[in-house]
């Protein structure tokens, strides 16, 4: 042992350790790369306060932030997917289901709840994109029909938040059949004269965009959401042409008249309440809370 080691051993020195930061405290914006405090991002409804990028949000969080606190009642939670075709690609479908259920805590890619919005009774549905890309299965179709039936029973509006890659290929024709099934259910809602508002979020593609997502009495999109049937890369490869900038994004679609409105997520709740109060001939709700404002909007106002 050297002389310096002997001195150090004799002295009562407290060793310093690196301060460990718990996992999940910080996250990074997918768009601008800004490092964000996780709790602050959640308070801002998963919208980056720096660049206003709308990150993906869980289905359950969407519904909890939409409906009045304590009013939520889940519908169709007993419906579970089954691998009736014994489908297998690079992985067995039943194994994909187990993995998706474990990762998301959901049984399938659509969550349905009834409740109130500023005191107005509504039924709301939301896709869970993290569950096999929010793909439409027979259970998703059945839950959506359950949502329509509940709206008919309660004589109230229906709101649906779409975030999906389209029909679930592992269920083949049974999945494609849900396009017709959900569209037929919405026709009953229209016959009754009950409002259906469709909110398209990033991404809304394939069979979902070709059915229930574009059948709203009013179609609202979040900023810069990708909305279409086939993706832009597939279209470019097929037509062998360069697509225009922003093709299939919300801003492009509203210019072409394909959607009715673009609404920021923090303003969505109040916007939906205002629209539904007018469509159902109810008094305009009184809004106490103010929607969060991004740094981009602050700079624009200045």
From Swiss-Prot:
Which Gene Ontology MF annotations are present?
Answer: acetyl-CoA carboxylase activity; ATP binding; carboxyl- or carbamoyltransferase activity; zinc ion binding
Report the pathway entry: Lipid metabolism; malonyl-CoA biosynthesis; malonyl-CoA from acetyl-CoA: step 1/1
Binding of Zn(2+), residues: 29, 32, 48, 51
Which Enzyme Commission numbers does its entry carry?
A: 2.1.3.15
Q: Which domain of life is it from?
A: Bacteria
Where does it localize? Cytoplasm
Entries under PANTHER family matching the protein: ACETYL-COENZYME A CARBOXYLASE CARBOXYL TRANSFERASE SUBUNIT BETA, CHLOROPLASTIC
**What is the protein name stated in its UniProt record?**
Acetyl-coenzyme A carboxylase carboxyl transferase subunit beta
Which source organism does the UniProt entry give? Serratia proteamaculans (strain 568)
**Gene name tied to this protein:** accD
């Amino acid at each position: 042992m050297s002389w310096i080691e002997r001195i150090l051993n004799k002295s009562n020195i407290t060793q310093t350790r690196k301060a460990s930061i718990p996992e999940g405290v910080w996250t990074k914006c997918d768009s601008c790369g800004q490092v964000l405090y996780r709790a602050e991002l959640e308070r801002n409804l998963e919208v980056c306060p720096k660049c206003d990028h709308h990150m993906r949000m869980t289905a359950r969080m969407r519904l909890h932030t939409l409906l009045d606190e304590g009013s939520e009642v889940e519908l169709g939670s007993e419906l579970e997917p089954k691998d009736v075709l014994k489908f297998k690609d690079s992985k067995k479908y039943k194994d994909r289901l187990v993995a998706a259920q474990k990762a998301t805590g959901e049984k399938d890619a659509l969550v349905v709840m009834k409740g109130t919005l500023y005191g107005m009774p509504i039924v709301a549905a939301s896709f869970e994109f993290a569950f096999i890309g929010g793909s439409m299965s027979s259970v998703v179709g059945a839950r959506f029909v359950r949502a329509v039936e509940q709206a008919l029973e309660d004589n109230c509006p229906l709101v649906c938040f779409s975030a999906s890659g389209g029909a679930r290929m592992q269920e083949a024709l049974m999945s494609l059949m849900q396009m017709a099934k959900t569209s037929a259910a919405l026709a009953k809602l229209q016959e009754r004269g009950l409002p259906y508002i469709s909110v398209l979020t990033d991404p809304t593609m394939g069979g979902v965009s070709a059915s229930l997502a574009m059948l709203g009495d009013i179609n609202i999109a979040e900023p810069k959401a990708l909305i279409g049937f086939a993706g832009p890369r597939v279209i470019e490869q097929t037509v062998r042409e360069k697509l225009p900038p922003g093709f299939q994004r919300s801003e492009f679609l509203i210019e072409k008249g394909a959607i009715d409105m673009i609404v920021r997520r923090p303003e969505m709740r109040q916007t939906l309440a205002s629209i539904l109060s007018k469509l159902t001939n109810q008094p305009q709700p009184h809004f106490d809370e103010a929607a969060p404002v991004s740094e981009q909007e602050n700079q624009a106002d200045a």
